[in-house]
UniProtKB/Swiss-Prot annotation:
GO terms for cellular component: cytosol. This is Phosphoribosylformylglycinamidine cyclo-ligase. Keywords: ATP-binding, Cytoplasm, Ligase, Nucleotide-binding, Purine biosynthesis. It catalyses: 2-formamido-N(1)-(5-O-phospho-beta-D-ribosyl)acetamidine + ATP = 5-amino-1-(5-phospho-beta-D-ribosyl)imidazole + ADP + phosphate + H(+). It comes from Bacillus cytotoxicus (strain DSM 22905 / CIP 110041 / 391-98 / NVH 391-98).
């Protein structure tokens, strides 16, 4: 049987074309430590010249979740790759690690070279923002597993940190100040609820602007996750950071305690930062209690860092000089978990 594999739904030539198209984007991410090029059986990275006394590799993996369904609906695929990178590199930078390289995994029902190129273009942009190299990946065409228009996307990153500079939160104590770095929006968590509340129950259109949103709903929901690597690494050069939390699934309530030692809790001052209109819209349309919102979404803060009180204002200034919106949002206290003070300030 001629072209048996193609008749089974796998187009090898389309896969080759996709690889050819993505090469120019991958090349823009290359660090000098990368050995070899795209197309080998494995990616190689030379650690020998990195100036660390006791180098420790730190790895992370994550996906984009059901935010992908918004990309399918909007037929927009050039930013979802930024999300994949962000979810991985933000997780390892909170331990003090500099991301070195990234690998992607794309599984699809039908290999569409143009669509795959757009996905990888976003991944490459995320890698440039994080300062890491895209050294490999896998594109798997799986007819019957996914529909022709569907794909899944996951990523994997490896970073490095000097052993004595690993941030674990073990030295956190009461009286440290918590600084929040603004998110770009929803980031990549909570989209199953977002779709149910706004699109299914609320019957909202992705093309319309609602309430106090400044963009059409689809553009707002597809804003890429903010990558905090460069400002955080700059911060670590100048100030001691005692703990960091990437605010992802589980929001404030689940993620902040991950950086706190036993016997220490966090007190958050509501109103110390502005919460973006998209969160207000979700809360109002879905009639969701405030506490639950903080247990699902980042609520406008994508990263929390703990520093000494005497350094707090200087740290905020440094982060602002790096282009971030940063706020003093609370403090560590004796106890456990996360407590909230005051009322919420919505933009």
């Amino acid at each position: 049987m001629a072209n048996a594999y193609k008749q089974a739904g796998v187009d090898i030539e389309a896969g080759y074309e996709a690889v050819s198209r993505m090469k120019k984007h991958v090349q823009t991410t290359m660090r000098k430590e990368v050995l070899g090029g795209l197309g080998g059986f494995g990616g190689m990275f030379d650690l020998s010249k990195l100036p660390l006394e006791e180098p420790v590799l730190v790895s992370g993996t994550d996906g984009v979740g059901t935010k992908l369904m918004l990309a399918f609906m909007a037929d927009k695929h050039d930013t979802i790759g930024i999300d994949a990178v962000a979810m991985c590199v933000n997780d390892i930078v909170v331990q003090g690690a500099e991301p070195l390289f990234f690998l992607d995994y794309i599984a699809c029902g039908k290999a569409d070279p143009s669509k795959i190129e757009h996905i990888v273009k976003g991944i490459a942009e995320g890698c440039r923002q994080a300062g890491c190299s895209l050294i490999g990946g896998e594109t798997a065409e799986m007819p019957g597993m996914y529909s022709k228009e569907e794909y899944d996307l996951a990523g994997f990153t490896v970073g490095i940190v000097d052993k004595k500079k690993i941030i674990t939160g073990h030295s956190l104590d009461e009286g440290h100040v918590l600084i929040g770095l603004a998110s770009s929006g929803i980031h990549s968590n909570g989209y199953s609820l977002v779709r149910k509340v706004l699109l299914e129950d609320g019957q909202m259109s992705l093309d319309r602007i609602y309430g106090r949103l400044e963009l059409p709903l689809g553009e707002e929901l597809l804003k890429p996750t903010k990558i905090y690597v460069k400002p955080i690494l700059e911060l670590l050069k100048k100030y001691e950071v005692y703990g960091m939390a990437h605010i992802t699934g589980g929001g404030f309530i689940e993620n902040i305690p991950r950086m706190l030692p036993k016997g220490i809790g966090a007190e958050i001052d509501l109103g110390s930062w502005n919460i973006q209109p998209i969160f207000s819209l979700i809360q109002e349309v879905g009639k969701i209690e405030e506490k639950e919102m903080f247990n699902i979404f980042n609520m406008g803060i994508g990263m929390v860092v703990a520093v000494k009180e005497e350094n707090a204002k200087a740290v905020v200034r440094l982060l602002e000089e790096q282009g971030e919106k940063a706020y003093i949002i609370g403090r560590t206290v004796k106890g456990s978990g996360v407590a909230f003070n005051g009322g919420i300030d919505h933009e």
